Amino acid sequence: MSLCTSSHKDFSQLLPLQDIGCNKTEIKNSPAGVISPAPYSCNQSTLTAEHSPVYIPSSYMESRHEYSTMAFCSPAMVNYNIASNFGDPEAVAARQTSSPGALWSAPGHLSPLSLHCQSSLLYAEQPKSLWCEARPMEPVLPGSRETLKRKTNGNDCTSPIANNPGSKKDAHFCAVCSDYASGYHYGVWSCEGCKAFFKRSIQGHNDYICPATNQCTIDKNRRKSCQACRLRKCYEVGMMKCGSRRERCGYRILRSHRGAEERVHCLGRARRYSEAATRVKEILLSTVSPEQFVLTLLEAEPPHVLVSRPSKPFTEASMMMSLTKLADKELVHMIGWAKKIPGFIDLSLYDQVRLLESCWMEVLMIGLMWRSIDHPGKLIFAPDLVLDRDEGKCVEGILEIFDMLLAMTSRFRELKLQHKEYLCVKAMILLNSSMFPLSAEEPESNRKLHHLLNVVTEALVWVIAKSGIPSQQQTTRLANLLMLLSHVRHASNKGMEHLLSMKCKNVVPVYDLLLEMLNAHTLRGQRKPLATHPEFGPLEQMEPGESLRKGEPQ
């Protein structure tokens, strides 16, 4: 036999192998932990040989003997025949001794065969070599980071992940649910699911409530079971709203500081632009032709207001109720009309409010005169509310006011007042109603007001000139129209006094915008002494503005 080339005493037992026979199909009683060779039949003379080499353990190489490589495939390859007396104890002992397991080291020693096997085959599936030791597969949990590192860095051939070409040796894990992390999100390593959940929570409503005790386990399989505990764990592991990295947070803080500086710079630049825009508007207003100005006034005219006519016979309460309702509706449209006059909104808010509070009754009365100019003896308050002088007798003190209105309407009828002239006169009443000291704190607004009044006067002169009358008569007509403005103001003062008396007698309730305008007229007379005191400015005396804001049509 050519198993060894020396006569060492430990291998003298291999000599009787030539005399041992067997009529069984497999070898039994192999040492524990060693897989027996593939079964073979004694009747076969020759078996197919598997040419995978078997190596002698390193412990035997330490001795001074050299052993050749051999393959244990069949009895024919080791040049012996199995004897027929299989039941002989000596044969059994010899057969046990001749087991290939005798050439291996103790079970605690790592098999040298595994060191020479291809790592991809060992880690991908069970070893296919006939003589590889069988070891149970250890399950590797993806959620355990330490286990995965130990399996990856070690030489354990049972790990299915360590040497798998598709595995993630440098993978990071989600700090919330221990799943594979997709990146560094909101300050920690996290998966796509936890990143999206945290983003939704900080951007929307996050009033989650735990149905249990706020101690739910959050892992890969149970992360969707409780939103409250999942969000709590997100904050516990360090997820933050400011960004994904600290340096990004610092960059955003720096960017916010730069943004504040830019905003301050932009505010200063916007202020300069506003001043320049104001000068441009003044230039444009000065270049507006009278014809264009009149056309703008024509487009700004408010619509007709309807009011339910009280049932006859009229009573003092029913007539005053209809008149106050009509006045309140017209005041709303009056504010919109004033804002459409070119240059009016460029005035300060203080001047806008004071002008409206001073002339609102005059504007209402001249509108009434224009509607009644073609109806002698009638006052057309609204298309559905037409009154004559006799119907005003039911209201105490209003008959005098009716007579004044009818007289002024008759005078406008004699002058054959044109529509464009009426538009200019009404705008002049608004802008010339400054019977109060203008704001000394805003001289720019006062200058704008005077300039705007000049523009309206030029427009009225242009309208009279376009009528075709001689130039001398044009001057006379302008004077006649302007003289009527004093009568309109006198009538408005009478009307204001009458309305106040009706309110004090509780004849008619006054509400909304009309009440504010009426109160402003009353308070102006009471606060006159404050105007001379150096500590009080006009704005502190009146505090106007509510009527303009509440009365503005939406």
Curated annotation (Swiss-Prot):
<dbReference type="InterPro" id="IPR001628">
    <property type="entry name" value="Znf_hrmn_rcpt"/>
</dbReference>
<protein>
    <recommendedName>
        <fullName>Estrogen receptor beta</fullName>
    </recommendedName>
</protein>
<dbReference type="InterPro" id="IPR028355">
    <property type="entry name" value="ER-beta/gamma"/>
</dbReference>
<dbReference type="GO" id="GO:0008270">
    <property type="term" value="F:zinc ion binding"/>
</dbReference>
<comment type="similarity">
    <text>Belongs to the nuclear hormone receptor family. NR3 subfamily.</text>
</comment>
<keyword id="KW-0863">Zinc-finger</keyword>
<dbReference type="GO" id="GO:0043565">
    <property type="term" value="F:sequence-specific DNA binding"/>
</dbReference>
<comment type="subunit">
    <text>Binds DNA as a homodimer. Can form a heterodimer with ER-alpha.</text>
</comment>
<dbReference type="Pfam" id="PF00105">
    <property type="entry name" value="zf-C4"/>
</dbReference>
<feature type="zinc finger region" description="NR C4-type">
    <location>
        <begin position="210"/>
        <end position="234"/>
    </location>
</feature>
<dbReference type="GO" id="GO:0030284">
    <property type="term" value="F:nuclear estrogen receptor activity"/>
</dbReference>
<feature type="DNA-binding region" description="Nuclear receptor">
    <location>
        <begin position="174"/>
        <end position="239"/>
    </location>
</feature>
<keyword id="KW-0754">Steroid-binding</keyword>
<dbReference type="GO" id="GO:0005634">
    <property type="term" value="C:nucleus"/>
</dbReference>
<comment type="function">
    <text>Binds estrogens with an affinity similar to that of ER-alpha, and activates expression of reporter genes containing estrogen response elements (ERE) in an estrogen-dependent manner. Locally synthesized estrogens may act via ER beta, in addition to ER alpha, to mediate seasonal or developmental effects on nearby song nuclei.</text>
</comment>
<dbReference type="InterPro" id="IPR050200">
    <property type="entry name" value="Nuclear_hormone_rcpt_NR3"/>
</dbReference>
<keyword id="KW-0805">Transcription regulation</keyword>
<feature type="region of interest" description="Disordered">
    <location>
        <begin position="529"/>
        <end position="554"/>
    </location>
</feature>
<keyword id="KW-0539">Nucleus</keyword>
<keyword id="KW-0862">Zinc</keyword>
<keyword id="KW-0675">Receptor</keyword>
<keyword id="KW-0446">Lipid-binding</keyword>
<dbReference type="InterPro" id="IPR000536">
    <property type="entry name" value="Nucl_hrmn_rcpt_lig-bd"/>
</dbReference>
<dbReference type="GO" id="GO:0030520">
    <property type="term" value="P:estrogen receptor signaling pathway"/>
</dbReference>
<keyword id="KW-0479">Metal-binding</keyword>
<feature type="domain" description="NR LBD">
    <location>
        <begin position="289"/>
        <end position="521"/>
    </location>
</feature>
<dbReference type="Pfam" id="PF12497">
    <property type="entry name" value="ERbeta_N"/>
</dbReference>
<dbReference type="InterPro" id="IPR035500">
    <property type="entry name" value="NHR-like_dom_sf"/>
</dbReference>
<feature type="zinc finger region" description="NR C4-type">
    <location>
        <begin position="174"/>
        <end position="194"/>
    </location>
</feature>
<feature type="region of interest" description="Modulating">
    <location>
        <begin position="25"/>
        <end position="173"/>
    </location>
</feature>
<dbReference type="GO" id="GO:0005496">
    <property type="term" value="F:steroid binding"/>
</dbReference>
<dbReference type="InterPro" id="IPR013088">
    <property type="entry name" value="Znf_NHR/GATA"/>
</dbReference>
<dbReference type="GO" id="GO:0071392">
    <property type="term" value="P:cellular response to estradiol stimulus"/>
</dbReference>
<dbReference type="InterPro" id="IPR024178">
    <property type="entry name" value="Est_rcpt/est-rel_rcp"/>
</dbReference>
<dbReference type="Pfam" id="PF00104">
    <property type="entry name" value="Hormone_recep"/>
</dbReference>
<dbReference type="InterPro" id="IPR001723">
    <property type="entry name" value="Nuclear_hrmn_rcpt"/>
</dbReference>
<keyword id="KW-0804">Transcription</keyword>
<dbReference type="InterPro" id="IPR021064">
    <property type="entry name" value="ER-beta-like_N"/>
</dbReference>
<keyword id="KW-0238">DNA-binding</keyword>
